[in-house]
Amino acid sequence: MDGARSVNKGTRGGEAGKGEKLADWADGRLGLYALAKANMRKVFPDHWSFMLGEICLYSFLILILTGVYLTLFFEPSGVEVVYHGSYEPLNGVVMTRAYESTLDISFDVRGGLLIRQIHHWAALVFVTGMLVHMMRVFFTGAFRKPRELNWVFGWTLLFLGIITGLTGYSLPDDLLSGTGIRFADGAILSIPIVGTYLSFFLFGGEFPGHDIIPRLFPIHVLVLPGIMLGLVVAHLILVFYHKHTQYPGPGRDNKSVVGMPFLPVYMAKAGGFFFLTFGVLALMGGLAQINPVWAFGPYSPQLVTTGAQPDWYLGFSEGLIRVMPGWEINFWGHTLEPGVFIPFSLFPLILLALGVYPFVEAWITGDKREHHILDRPRNVPVRTGLGVAWLSLYVVLLIGGGNDIVATHLHLSINAITWFVRVSVFVVPVLAFIVTKRICLGLQRRDRDKVLHGRETGTIRRLPHGEYVEVHEPLAQEQLHTLTQHEQEPPYEIGPLVDANGVRRPVKRSQWVRAGLARAMFGPDTRIEKPTAEEYREITSGDHH
């Protein structure tokens, strides 16, 4: 007698197809159906600024794909060879095998130059996207609880992206990349006591040595991308776990999200946007030349490229070095270089200031609540002013890093530009903060007037007694909600200095500092009180003009 057989039934009653059987097999071992059921209808809000994070993700994936292709042909070797290849102007020139293989990729490997340029453009877009994405998160307060850890992940990705870019464009060993390595070596040598030892350890001897490229290669293609890939995965997991932030609007609060489901709407849009990003980068790689290494020639320690500039995201670090006075201190037979070491130390500190801000603000406010509704930047003028001040400092230092380019193109004195940048480093961020804060307060006043008096229609009406007035149109409920939904919590205060028994209670110095910062950041001078319901009803009832 034949044994009974169990047949998998498909969704339409017939025998399951191969794809469905494979899915059933995977579900029996991984529980995919339960995972999909829990997340496929997860709602994601729809706003153009949320695409900034997706640009970063897609650029990172494109970097991995193009990087794998380039790795197949690049040889990270400092061994010197005589070039005999397709680029005739360099035939017979002594160069490293790394530079020779880069030339081979550019001229002999099918599609090699296109992939090289896509890779470089994707790196620039990746870092640019991360910075712009973090600024969106910063200005809207999306870093608040429970997303502080995700902010740290994002900041770490930005820092590692900058370091990965530095190691990447140092690999070809052309004159421009070698100049960048020399710049880094000078910064390392400026470290007191251990600088020389670190330089010898990194380069395997005196600069330039033969070990730096073989050592940078695994860091660039394995270590840093592996760490970044793990951080990207963790970042996305936390986005799913915490649910996405959303801009204020009707029906949106800290408990509900208004938007489109993950499947199929969001995934369809995400897939299309990935290919759109890839297409744009492919066009940039095919039409816009970047880093023509053959034009620079091989690196030689006694040569330097006129107008040598790093990628934009490292320009501010060079600006720090260029505008710093060339101080030198001789102490007990040792030479200290504060003119290099101080700006070299400020490089990570400027980035660190951005990374620690969420924790500083949380300590000042003492706010322990979860926040899923984004702030409008105008409603938090001090935070917005600080962000603009940080960006203005970045731009000023970027100009300082290109002072020679500015001088030659605009026919200006390089010394005048250097002194302008030195003064601007201290003046411009302060002015940017003040102007931004005043603009935010002005926008708050305009919002208050719009809520109480409505929108200007441009229609002028003459009253019976001869007075001319402009007709205002009441705002829609959606607009009223957007303009008035924000909370205006009182700032942290120390409270009474004596208790009910008249005994002076101890107050720590940190509490005084916290209270002072709270007044400066969230006190009455930093906001325009939004209209109350009573004021709105009184104005709209017609009792007042």
Put a short name on every predicted segment.
Residues 323-339:
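Membrane-interface amphipathic/re-entrant loop segments adjacent to transmembrane helices
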